[in-house]
């Protein structure tokens, strides 16, 4: 039996809002609070993601944060698929989860960079595309040995791969929005990489 349009719209809105709030549950922030009684945002880069958590907690903290952030990015899209919601709602849940990770309300809009939850969500939405994006990540990592640059390459490549693989417009557009969000979150890193590159040429 089909839900009435208004009721279906409320469910969609609830799922999208829930995805944002879930995204704001920053794994690295809570792990560092638990293990060190410190605010990870006052350490290193100031981000709550896996790379910065790893600076404070070591390899174990990095891996736990990476897995936690990827899982939370996957959860809302997985629930959307379970309840057979529309592709548009599914993609909006993916975007909202990543937005919550980058700009968490409960942490004063100071979160992570968004790569791990984005890749976790993409894995649920389109496993084949996620595999191709992972290939881009590994290729760039092998060339540069830079985790941040490799993650950016994978995320920027995702909407292009989606178009090449003739995926629905909503998916390709949503992945482009994700890429913009993640670029914004990495703007400081990008400036630093450009400055280093410029200094090497001198």
From Swiss-Prot:
Top EC class for this record: transferase
InterPro entries, alphabetized: G3P_acylTferase_PlsY (IPR003811)
Main location: membrane
Transmembrane segments: 8-28, 85-105, 122-142, 146-166, 173-190
SMART domains noted in UniProt: G3P_acyltransf (SM01207)
KW Transmembrane (keyword) present: yes
Domain of life: Bacteria
GO MF annotation terms: acyl-phosphate glycerol-3-phosphate acyltransferase activity
Reaction catalyzed: an acyl phosphate + sn-glycerol 3-phosphate = a 1-acyl-sn-glycero-3-phosphate + phosphate
Pathway per the UniProt entry: Lipid metabolism; phospholipid metabolism
Compartment list: Cell membrane
EC number(s) per entry: 2.3.1.275
GO biological process per UniProt: phospholipid biosynthetic process
Keywords: Cell membrane, Lipid biosynthesis, Lipid metabolism, Membrane, Phospholipid biosynthesis, Phospholipid metabolism, Transferase, Transmembrane, Transmembrane helix
Membrane topology of the entry: Multi-pass membrane protein
Annotated GO CC locations: plasma membrane
Alphabetical list of PANTHER family matching this protein: GLYCEROL-3-PHOSPHATE ACYLTRANSFERASE-RELATED, INNER MEMBRANE PROTEIN YGIH
Sequence similarity: Belongs to the PlsY family.
Function in brief: Catalyzes the transfer of an acyl group from acyl-phosphate (acyl-PO(4)) to glycerol-3-phosphate (G3P) to form lysophosphatidic acid (LPA). This enzyme utilizes acyl-phosphate as fatty acyl donor, but not acyl-CoA or acyl-ACP.
Subunit structure: Probably interacts with PlsX.
Protein name stated in the entry: Glycerol-3-phosphate acyltransferase 1
Organism of derivation: Desulfitobacterium hafniense (strain Y51)
């Amino acid at each position: 039996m089909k839900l009435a349009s208004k009721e279906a719209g409320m469910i969609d809105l609830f799922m999208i809002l829930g995805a944002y709030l879930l995204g704001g549950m920053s794994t690295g922030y809570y792990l560092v609070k638990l293990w060190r009684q410190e605010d990870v945002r006052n350490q290193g880069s100031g981000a709550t993601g896996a790379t910065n958590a790893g600076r404070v907690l070591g390899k174990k903290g990095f891996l736990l944060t990476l897995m936690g952030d990827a899982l939370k990015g996957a959860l809302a899209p997985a629930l959307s698929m379970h309840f057979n919601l529309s592709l548009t709602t599914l993609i909006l849940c993916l975007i909202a989860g990543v937005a919550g990770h980058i700009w968490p309300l409960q942490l004063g809009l100071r979160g992570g960079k968004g790569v791990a939850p984005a890749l976790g969500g993409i894995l649920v939405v389109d496993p084949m595309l996620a595999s191709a994006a992972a290939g881009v990540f590994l290729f760039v990592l092998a060339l540069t040995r830079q985790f941040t640059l490799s993650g950016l390459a994978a995320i920027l490549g995702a909407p292009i791969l989606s178009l090449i693989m003739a995926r629905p417009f909503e998916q390709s557009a949503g992945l482009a929005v994700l890429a913009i969000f993640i670029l914004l979150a990495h703007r400081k890193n990008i400036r630093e990489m450009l400055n280093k590159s410029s200094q090497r040429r001198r």
